[in-house]
C-alpha cells in the first residue's frame, strides 16, 4: 500500500524536557521521524518545549514551535498551521496524553486533522487500565488479578480481598510516577493518594504483585495491512517489582527455552493485532520461572525507552520505520537503511549480547532512598555490546563513569555476611556488586538466588567474572619485596590475558589485582599482541553486507573494521545522561560530527548512550559503541590512527580524557590540554586572572580542615566551598559559619581525597553567563545570559534570560572585554563558557569552562549562530573572519528567550527541593516572546508550574530574607491570595499590616502546614531555606509535601518575583502570538 496521497503537511509532537522516565530517547525518535517524513516529501510542523534537542533545530522541520506542551498551545499551532495529520506516538507519554486531550476537546475534528499511526481507540485500549484488561481477557491472554480504583478506600478493600503485596499503577503517567508496591495497608494508603493525584484521569490500577517472576519484553512492529514482526526480545536481569527503566536489561533474552520464547512472541503479536497498533509497540510480560505461567503486564502503544534500546541493540531503525508505517507504507515496502538490500519486514538477528545499565543520580543526592521499585529513579542509561554476557556487563559498568571499573566495590569488604544478605534481599543500585562480593566469599549460588530471585544463569555468569579475578590474582608476584608499578608480573601470560579479556576484565581491574598500573598492563598487552578486534552491528548477523555499520570491541580473531586511509577526526561523546551533563552535550557532539562531514572529513564518534542521536546508525561515518574510559578509547585510537581528536563537545567526560589521549601521542584539536588545565586548575587560573587584572571573589585552596578554616576566616563568611574539578556543582555548598564548615569538611571532602577543597568568599549578586567562540585571536560572543536567581544557585538550575533585561551598555561592554581577555590568554580554539557575578556594581569572574556548555543549544537557536559548527571548523584550522564572522558582542534579537530548569523531584522521594550551588535539574525548557513577562509565562508553563490564579499561599521565610520578601507577599495579597504562615513569619507580616492565617509547625501537632498541603488546601508555597538539610526539619517536610501534591514550591525569592510577574501577565489575559523558530532571528 503506497503512501497516502492526501497527506501534505504533518504535525509532530515532541516529548518536552528531560525528566526521570522520559529522556533523550524521544529526541532520537523525533529526529528520525522528522527526517523520515521529509524523505516522503511531506511538510513537517513540530511543537516541542525543549531547546536542547536536535529535533528542534531549524533544519529538522519546516516550521518549529518551541512552545509549552499543553492542549491550549497544541490547539493554537493546529489552528495556525492547519496540518492534515498529527503524529503523536514519537513524543513519549507527553505526546500521547496531548493527542488524547486535543482529540477529546474536539480540536482535531474542528480542523479536520487525523491522527497518524496508532488510532486513538487503540491508544485508549492500551493506556486505560480497564479497557486493556478486558481486551486481554477477550483474546485469552492472562492478566494479574486487578481492580481499577478511583478512591483510596476502594483500593484498601480490594487489597484485603487478594492479599498483600499489591502493585499500584496510575493511568496515563510516565516512569511509574506515583506508583509503587505496597506491603501493608498504611503503605497502600500513602501510594494510592499519590498515584491518584498524579494520574490525569484520577485512576489507578491495583493488582496482584508477582514479585520474583522474570520480566520479559518484546519490541514489535505492525503496519496497516496487518504485517507484524518482533524486532527484539529483552530480559530484565532483575525480577518483577523493579521498573524496567531501573532494571539492568539484556538482549536478546538469555534464559528462556525455545518453547517459552515462542509462547511469549506469539502472545505479543496477538496483542498488537488485537490493539490495532500501527507502528512500534512494546509488550511486557511476567513469566513464572517454575512453570509456563505468564501474565501480560502492560503495553506501550508508542515509542519508548525500550524501543530506543531495541533499536540500538539490533540496528533496526524503529522510529524511522514506525513513521513510514504511519503515513501508509507497509513493512515490505520500506528498505532497511543499514543493509540497503533487505526490507523492514525482516526480523533482525543478533550474534552478540547487549546489556543496558541504568545511571542513577544517587551520587548527587546522597540522602535519597536508593531502594528500587516500580517508580523509576534513573536519569539515563548506558549500553554495551560484547560476545558474552560477562564482557557486555563489565563494559556497561565501565561506561557508567562512577569511578568503578569492575564488579568490585572496595567498601563492601568491610561488611559482614549478615549485612550483605540483608542488602541483597532489597533491590538497590548496588545489587550486582553485592552479589559479586557474596560469590567471592563462597556463598552458594542457590542461597543468592533465594535472596534476590535473579536467575541462576546470571549468577553463574557473575561467578565466572569473580573466578577470572582469582586467576589474575594468582599471577601476582609472591615476594613482597617487588615494588608495584615497576612492571607487569611475568605470570600475566598472553594466554591468561586473552582469557580474562574475553570475559571483559579491564586493564585497571587486572592492574589492581596484580599490584601494577593500568598503563603498564596496557603496554604489556600491546607488546604480547593481546588486542581487541572490532565487530559489526548489521541487523542480520552478517548475512548481508552492511552499508552503515557500527562497531563494538571484543577479544576474538577476526576483525571486521578496516581503517580507511582518509582524513578523519574522532569526536568523543558525553556518555549517559545524568544531572549536570544532559542532552545538551549530545546536541554539541552531533553538530560537530555534521560540521566535519560538511568539510569532507570522515567523522568517527565514540559513545555509549543508546538514547541519543549521536549513536544513531547514520549520524557519523563510523560509530564505536564503547565505554568512554582511557583503555577503550585508546584501543580505538590505536586502531583508527585519526588526524585528531575533539574533546570540547562531550562535557566533562570528554575533557577528562584529553590528557590520557594526548599522553598516548594523539593530537587534541581545539584548545590545548595545557590551556584546559590552566582554566580548570584553581591556582593557575587565579594567577591568570590576577595577571589580567580581572576581579575575582577572594578565596584559596585548603589542603586540610585547618587550612580551610583559616581561609574562611580571612575572607569572611559566608563562603562557597567545593572540591576541585567538579561538574554540576557536586558537593558544593554555601556555609555561613565555622561550625557549618566543619560539618561540610567531615562529609564532603571525602568526595575526592586526592584533591583539596576550594574556599571562596560568597558574593551576593546577579549571575551572568557568557558563551563565546574564539579562534585564538578573534572572539565572538553570541550573547550574554542574565540569571533570574542570584549567584549561589547553580547556573543549570537558574532561569536564564536572553537578551539581558537589566544590564547597562557599560556592563555588557565590560563583560565582553573580560571574556575576550580570558579567551585570548587561554588560547581558546573553539568554545568557552564563562560565569560572572555582578556584585555592588562590579563584575567578578566566577569560573571558566574551556568547552561547550549546557547553554550552547539554547543560545545557538535564539541567535541563529551555528556555534558548534564554527567551533569545529576552528578546530580544523579556520579563523572566524574566514568563516564570515567578525569578533565582538553580537547584535541582540528583538525576541526575548527565557530558559527554565525542569526538576524530577516527584520521582525522588527524600530529596530536598531547595535550590543551591549543587545542581538538581534534569532538563530544560524555553519560552519566547517579544514581551518579557509572556516569555517568562511560557517558560514557567513549559516547566510544568501549574500556577494558581488565587487561593491560599504558605509563606515561611528565613529571618535573613524577611525584609526582602515583604513586597512579594504584598503582591500575592494584591493578586487575591490569602496568606498562611507559621508563628514567626506571621508575627513579622502582621507587624507590617498584612492579614495572615497562622498554621502550626509540624512538631506542634495537627492540623499543621504539611496536613493543609496534603489535604489540597494550599495552592502555592514560598519557602526560603533555614539552615540545616536534615529531613526532619519543618522546611524540608513542607517542600516535599508540596512536590508530592503537585503544589508549586518556590525556594528562591528571585524565582518567586518572576512567578508573581507571570501571574500578573496571566490575569491581564494578554494574547500570546506563536513565533516559529525560523522567524526568531529574521
From Swiss-Prot:
MF term (GO), any: metal ion binding
InterPro entries documented for this protein: ATP-grasp, CarbamoylP_synth_lsu, CarbamoylP_synth_lsu_oligo, CarbamoylP_synth_lsu_oligo_sf, CbamoylP_synth_lsu-like_ATP-bd, CbamoylP_synth_lsu_CPSase_dom, MGS-like_dom, MGS-like_dom_sf
EC category name: ligase
Ranges where the ATP-grasp domain occurs: 133-327, 686-876
Keywords: Amino-acid biosynthesis, Arginine biosynthesis, ATP-binding, Ligase, Magnesium, Manganese, Metal-binding, Nucleotide-binding, Pyrimidine biosynthesis, Repeat
Residues binding Mg(2+) 2, per UniProt: 298, 300
Cofactors, names only: Mg(2+); Mn(2+)
Function: Large subunit of the glutamine-dependent carbamoyl phosphate synthetase (CPSase). CPSase catalyzes the formation of carbamoyl phosphate from the ammonia moiety of glutamine, carbonate, and phosphate donated by ATP, constituting the first step of 2 biosynthetic pathways, one leading to arginine and/or urea and the other to pyrimidine nucleotides.
Assembly notes: Composed of two chains; the small (or glutamine) chain promotes the hydrolysis of glutamine to ammonia, which is used by the large (or ammonia) chain to synthesize carbamoyl phosphate. Tetramer of heterodimers (alpha,beta)4.
The name this protein goes by in its record: Carbamoyl phosphate synthase large chain
UniProt organism field: Desulforudis audaxviator (strain MP104C)
The gene coding this protein: carB
Amino acid at each position: 500500500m503506497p503512501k497516502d496521497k492526501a497527506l501534505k503537511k504533518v504535525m509532530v509532537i515532541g516529548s518536552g524536557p528531560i525528566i526521570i522516565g522520559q529522556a533523550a530517547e524521544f529526541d532520537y525518535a523525533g529526529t528520525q521521524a522528522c527526517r523520515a517524513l521529509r524523505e516522503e516529501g511531506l511538510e513537517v510542523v513540530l511543537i516541542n518545549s525543549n531547546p536542547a534537542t536536535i529535533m528542534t533545530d531549524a533544519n529538522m522541520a519546516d516550521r518549529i514551535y518551541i512552545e509549552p506542551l499543553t492542549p491550549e498551545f497544541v490547539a493554537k499551532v493546529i489552528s495556525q498551521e492547519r496540518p492534515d495529520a498529527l503524529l503523536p506516538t514519537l513524543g513519549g507519554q507527553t505526546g500521547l496524553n496531548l493527542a488524547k486531550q486535543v482529540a477529546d476537546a474536539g480540536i482535531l475534528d474542528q480542523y479536520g486533522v487525523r491522527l497518524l499511526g496508532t488510532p486513538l481507540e487503540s491508544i485508549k485500549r492500551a493506556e486505560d487500565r480497564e479497557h486493556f484488561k478486558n481486551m486481554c481477557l477477550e483474546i485469552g491472554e492472562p492478566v494479574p488479578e486487578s481492580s481499577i480504583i478511583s478512591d483510596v478506600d476502594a483500593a484498601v478493600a480490594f487489597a484485603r480481598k487478594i492479599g498483600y503485596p499489591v502493585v499500584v499503577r496510575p493511568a496515563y503517567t510516565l516512569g511509574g510516577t506515583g506508583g509503587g508496591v505496597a506491603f501493608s495497608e498504611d503503605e497502600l494508603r500513602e501510594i494510592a493518594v499519590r498515584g491518584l493525584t498524579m494520574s490525569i484521569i484520577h485512576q489507578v490500577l491495583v493488582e496482584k504483585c508477582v514479585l520474583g517472576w522474570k520480566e520479559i519484553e518484546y519490541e514489535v512492529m505492525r503496519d496497516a495491512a496487518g504485517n507484524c514482526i518482533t524486532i527484539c526480545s529483552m530480559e530484565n536481569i532483575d525480577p518483577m517489582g523493579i521498573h524496567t527503566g531501573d532494571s539492568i536489561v539484556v538482549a536478546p533474552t538469555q534464559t528462556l527455552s525455545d518453547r517459552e520464547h515462542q509462547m511469549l512472541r506469539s502472545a505479543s503479536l496477538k496483542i498488537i493485532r488485537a490493539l490495532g497498533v500501527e507502528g512500534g509497540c512494546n509488550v511486557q510480560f511476567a513469566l513464572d520461572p517454575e512453570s509456563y505461567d505468564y501474565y501480560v503486564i502492560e503495553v506501550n502503544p508508542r515509542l519508548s525507552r525500550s524501543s530506543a534500546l531495541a533499536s540500538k541493540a539490533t540496528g533496526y531503525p524503529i522510529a524511522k520505520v514506525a513513521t513510514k508505517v504511519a503515513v501508509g507504507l507497509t513493512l515490505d515496502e520500506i528498505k532497511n537503511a543499514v543493509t540497503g538490500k533487505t526490507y523492514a519486514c525482516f526480523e533482525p538477528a543478533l550474534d552478540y549480547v547487549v546489556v543496558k545499565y541504568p545511571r542513577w543520580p544517587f551520587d548527587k543526592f546522597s540522602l535519597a532512598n536508593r531502594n528500587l521499585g516500580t517508580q523509576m529513579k534513573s536519569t539515563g542509561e548506558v549500553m554495551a555490546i560484547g560476545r558474552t554476557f560477562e564482557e557486555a556487563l563489565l563494559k556497561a559498568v565501565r561506561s557508567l563513569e562512577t569511578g568503578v571499573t569492575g564488579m568490585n566495590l572496595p567498601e563492601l569488604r568491610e561488611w559482614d555476611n549478615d549485612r550483605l544478605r540483608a542488602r541483597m534481599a532489597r533491590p538497590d543500585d548496588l545489587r550486582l556488586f553485592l552479589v559479586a562480593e557474596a560469590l567471592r566469599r563462597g556463598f552458594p549460588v542457590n542461597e543468592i538466588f533465594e535472596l534476590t530471585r535473579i536467575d541462576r544463569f546470571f549468577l553463574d555468569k557473575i561467578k565466572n567474572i569473580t573466578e577470572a579475578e582469582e586467576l589474575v590474582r594468582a599471577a601476582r608476584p609472591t615476594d613482597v619485596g617487588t615494588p608495584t608499578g615497576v612492571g607487569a608480573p611475568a605470570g600475566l601470560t598472553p594466554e591468561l590475558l586473552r582469557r580474562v579479556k574475553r570475559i571483559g576484565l579491564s586493564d585497571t581491574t587486572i592492574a589492581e589485582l596484580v599490584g601494577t598500573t593500568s598503563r603498564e598492563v596496557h603496554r604489556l598487552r600491546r607488546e604480547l599482541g593481546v588486542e581487541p578486534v572490532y565487530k559489526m552491528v548489521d541487523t542480520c548477523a552478517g548475512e548481508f553486507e552492511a552499508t552503515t555499520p557500527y562497531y563494538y570491541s571484543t577479544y576474538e580473531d577476526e576483525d571486521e573494521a578496516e581503517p580507511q586511509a582518509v582524513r578523519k577526526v574522532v569526536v568523543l561523546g558525553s556518555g549517559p545522561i545524568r544531572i549536570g551533563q544532559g542532552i545538551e552535550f549530545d546536541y554539541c557532539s552531533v553538530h560537530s560530527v555534521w560540521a566535519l562531514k560538511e568539510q569532507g572529513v570522515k567523522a568517527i564518534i565514540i559513545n555509549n548512550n543508546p538514547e541519543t542521536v549521536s549513536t544513531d546508525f547514520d549520524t557519523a561515518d563510523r560509530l564505536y559503541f564503547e565505554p568512554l574510559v582511557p583503555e577503550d578509547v585508546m584501543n580505538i585510537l590505536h586502531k583508527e590512527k585519526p588526524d585528531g581528536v575533539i574533546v570540547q563537545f562531550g562535557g566533562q567526560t570528554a575533557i577528562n580524557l584529553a590528557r590520557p589521549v594526548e599522553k598516548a601521542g594523539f593530537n587534541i584539536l581545539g584548545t590545548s590540554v595545557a590551556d584546559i588545565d590552566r582554566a580548570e586548575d584553581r591556582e593557575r587560573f587565579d594567577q591568570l586572572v590576577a595577571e589580567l587584572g580581572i576581579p575575582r571573589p577572594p578565596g584559596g585552596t585548603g589542603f586540610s580542615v585547618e587550612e580551610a578554616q583559616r581561609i574562611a576566616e580571612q575572607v569572611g563568611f559566608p563562603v562557597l566551598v567545593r572540591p576541585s574539578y567538579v561538574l554540576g556543582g557536586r558537593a558544593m555548598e554555601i556555609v555561613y559559619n565555622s561550625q557549618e564548615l566543619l560539618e561540610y569538611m567531615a562529609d564532603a571532602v571525602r568526595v575526592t581525597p586526592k584533591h583539596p577543597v576550594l574556599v571562596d568568599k560568597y558574593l551576593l549578586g546577579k549571575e551572568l553567563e557568557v558563551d563565546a567562540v574564539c579562534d585564538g585571536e578573534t572572539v565572538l560572543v553570541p550573547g550574554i545570559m542574565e540569571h533570574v536567581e542570584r549567584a549561589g544557585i547553580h547556573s543549570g538550575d537558574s532561569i536564564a534570560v536572553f537578551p539581558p533585561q537589566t544590564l547597562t551598555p557599560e556592563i555588557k561592554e565590560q563583560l565582553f572585554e573580560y571574556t575576550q581577555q580570558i579567551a585570548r590568554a587561554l588560547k581558546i580554539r573553539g568554545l568557552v563558557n564563562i560565569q560572572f557575578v555582578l556584585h555592588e556594581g562590579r563584575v567578578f569572574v566566577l569560573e571558566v569552562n574551556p568547552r561547550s556548555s549546557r547553554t550552547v543549544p539554547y543560545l545557538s537557536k535564539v541567535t541563529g549562530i551555528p556555534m558548534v559548527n564554527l567551533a569545529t571548523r576552528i578546530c580544523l584550522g579556520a579563523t572566524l573572519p574566514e568563516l564570515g564572522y567578525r569578533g565582538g558582542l553580537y547584535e541582540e534579537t528583538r525576541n526575548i528567550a527565557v530558559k527554565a530548569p525542569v526538576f524530577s523531584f516527584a520521582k525522588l522521594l527524600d530529596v530536598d527541593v531547595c535550590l543551591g550551588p549543587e545542581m538538581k535539574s534534569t532538563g530544560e525548557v524555553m519560552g519566547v516572546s517579544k514581551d518579557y513577562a509572556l516569555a517568562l509565562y511560557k517558560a514557567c508553563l513549559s516547566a510544568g508550574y501549574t500556577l494558581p490564579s488565587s487561593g491560599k499561599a504558605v509563606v515561611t521565610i528565613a529571618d535573613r530574607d524577611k525584609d526582602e520578601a515583604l513586597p512579594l507577599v504584598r503582591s500575592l495579597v494584591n493578586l487575591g491570595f490569602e496568606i498562611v504562615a507559621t508563628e514567626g513569619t506571621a508575627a513579622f507580616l502582621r507587624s507590617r499590616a498584612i492579614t495572615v492565617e497562622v498554621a502550626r509547625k509540624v512538631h506542634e501537632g495537627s492540623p499543621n502546614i504539611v496536613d493543609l498541603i496534603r489535604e489540597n488546601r494550599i495552592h502555592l508555597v514560598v519557602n526560603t531555606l533555614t539552615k540545616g538539610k536534615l529531613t526532619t526539619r519543618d522546611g524540608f517536610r513542607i517542600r516535599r509535601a508540596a512536590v508530592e501534591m503537585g503544589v508549586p514550591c518556590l525556594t528562591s525569592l528571585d524565582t518567586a518575583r518572576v512567578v508573581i510577574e507571570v501571574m500578573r501577565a496571566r490575569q491581564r489575559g494578554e494574547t500570546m502570538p506563536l513565533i516559529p523558530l525560523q522567524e526568531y532571528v529574521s
